[in-house]
């Protein structure tokens, strides 16, 4: 799902309530924290041409190789900066999920697209991460003469952490008999 139902209802002001309980697949265990999530795409445009003369072209796939290497460095930087023992995987993740480029083995790749997913820790902000990624990609591809476009595939869900002594968390823990848990997926919270 697009996990936008609760947000839409809140924006419409209906119904007016102090809080809401949103059903998620957690075995009735209340969620006190979840990672944020975003899905984006990096689109690179080079210059295609025949493979017999690469000097007349600009290979977008080779540029994407450099971008991927930098994204993997960024992933390690985030891992060292953001840690929380609340989560089974105690650091942010960046998954390189899908790559498409080129149109024929005997042609220089003129375009290459990379789709990725990130799971953000509390304290990380979606737009700041997106700005960091755009800056890093520009740093890699601008000297290569490659055009870059950034696309948001899913607006994202910010990371969540329940306020200390949350009345709603205490009530749901009491009603379910379960202590609040942290999950690595985004909820509508």
Where are these regions (language model features)?
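Acidic/histidine-rich catalytic neighborhood of metal-dependent amide-processing enzymes
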Residues: 1-39
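Residue-level signal for inorganic ion chemistry
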Residues: 24, 64, 116
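Short glycine-rich, acidic/polar surface loops and turns
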Residues: 26-29, 99-102, 183-189
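Short, solvent-exposed beta-strand/turn "edge" segments of beta-rich domains on protein surfaces
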Residues: 33, 104-109
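The feature captures the short pre-catalytic strand/loop hairpin that immediately precedes
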Residues: 40-47
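Hydrophobic beta-strand positions in extracellular immunoglobulin-like domains
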Residues: 44, 118-120
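Acidic-enriched catalytic cores of C-N bond-cleaving enzymes acting on peptides and small amides
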Residues: 51-99, 107-108, 122-148
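An extended, acidic, His-containing surface patch that forms the Zn2+-binding/catalytic region
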Residues: 80-86, 90, 95, 147-189
């Amino acid at each position: 799902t697009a996990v936008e139902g609760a947000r839409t209802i809140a924006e419409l002001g209906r119904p007016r309530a102090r809080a809401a309980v949103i059903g998620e697949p957690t075995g009735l265990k209340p969620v006190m924290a979840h990672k944020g999530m975003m899905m984006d795409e990096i689109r690179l445009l080079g210059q295609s041409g025949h493979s017999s003369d690469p000097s007349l072209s600009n290979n977008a796939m080779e540029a994407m190789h450099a971008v991927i290497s930098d994204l993997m460095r960024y992933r390690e930087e985030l891992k060292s900066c953001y840690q929380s023992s609340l989560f089974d995987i105690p650091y942010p993740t960046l998954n390189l999920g899908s790559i498409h480029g080129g149109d024929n083995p005997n042609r220089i790749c003129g375009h290459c697209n990379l789709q990725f997913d990130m799971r953000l820790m509390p304290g990380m902000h979606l737009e700041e991460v997106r700005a960091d990624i755009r800056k890093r990609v520009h740093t890699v591809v601008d000297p290569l003469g490659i055009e870059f476009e950034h696309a948001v595939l899913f607006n994202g869900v910010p990371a969540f952490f329940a306020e200390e002594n949350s009345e709603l968390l205490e009530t749901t823990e009491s009603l379910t008999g379960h202590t609040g848990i942290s999950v690595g997926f985004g909820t509508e919270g």
